[in-house]
């Protein structure tokens, strides 16, 4: 799929879910804040409970850019963990390496963060990690491989080039962009995680299956 096709696909999905998944989609939603398609402007019929839960699950999945199987595994772990399942789920997903790379400003989008990880540009505590799903522990340091620091994507990041499109830095991260590094100082809490999702509806979706 070409870059243009991927951008168009993300924009269409953003409109369907009502959330911006990329900076370009955010600008597009400002102009066309309705679902895609012939009847996008018209008032939708009231969705069924199932449709509402399904859309919320799709919202969460799309914001982390993960497959259904990955979300289901995370949900099962969240259900086994003490506390509220929905909050646990978001907190588990937020510890993904690709999520923290974009959250810290080292990448502009989740897709770019995943690419940087897969191409072995990202290290955790001095070791290269090429799995976007890697679970970062509290206290661990995420940083760019020294040989990659001079490349254009990271020079843009070091200059704060993504600040205009990313949410405010959450309190569970300490970031030194000039050094291209970020530390997960403690585990995230749901209320601090900048994702748009009614997590209880996601719990209800899986509970009904």
Swiss-Prot record:
GO terms for MF: rRNA binding; structural constituent of ribosome
Domain S4 RNA-binding, chain residue ranges per copy: 95-160
GO cellular component: small ribosomal subunit
InterPro entries cross-referenced by the UniProt entry: Ribosomal_uS4 (IPR022801), Ribosomal_uS4_bac-type (IPR005709), Ribosomal_uS4_CS (IPR018079), Ribosomal_uS4_N (IPR001912), S4_RNA-bd (IPR002942), S4_RNA-bd_sf (IPR036986)
Leader sequence segment: none
Subunit and interaction comment: Part of the 30S ribosomal subunit. Contacts protein S5. The interaction surface between S4 and S5 is involved in control of translational fidelity.
Protein's name in the database: Small ribosomal subunit protein uS4
Organism: Clavibacter sepedonicus (Clavibacter michiganensis subsp. sepedonicus)
Taxonomic lineage: Bacteria, Bacillati, Actinomycetota, Actinomycetes, Micrococcales
């Amino acid at each position: 799929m070409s870059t243009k096709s991927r951008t168009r696909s993300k924009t269409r999905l953003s409109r369907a879910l009502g959330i911006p998944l990329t900076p370009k989609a955010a600008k597009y939603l400002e102009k066309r804040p309705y679902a895609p398609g012939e009847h996008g402007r018209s008032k939708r019929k009231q969705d069924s409970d199932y449709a509402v839960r399904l859309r919320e699950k799709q919202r969460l999945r799309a914001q982390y850019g993960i497959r259904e199987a990955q979300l289901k595994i995370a949900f099962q772990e969240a259900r086994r963990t003490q506390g509220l399942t929905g909050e646990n789920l978001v907190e588990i997903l937020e510890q993904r390496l690709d999520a923290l790379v974009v959250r810290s400003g080292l990448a502009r989008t989740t897709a770019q963060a995943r690419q940087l990880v897969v191409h072995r540009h990202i290290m955790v505590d001095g070791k290269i990690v090429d799995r976007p799903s890697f679970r970062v522990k509290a206290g661990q340091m995420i940083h760019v491989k020294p040989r990659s620091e001079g490349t254009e994507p990271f020079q843009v990041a070091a200059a704060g080039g993504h600040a205009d499109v990313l949410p405010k830095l959450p309190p569970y991260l300490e970031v030194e962009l000039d050094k291209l590094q970020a530390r997960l100082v403690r585990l995230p809490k749901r209320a601090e995680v900048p994702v748009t999702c009614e997590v209880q509806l996601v719990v209800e979706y899986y509970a009904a299956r």
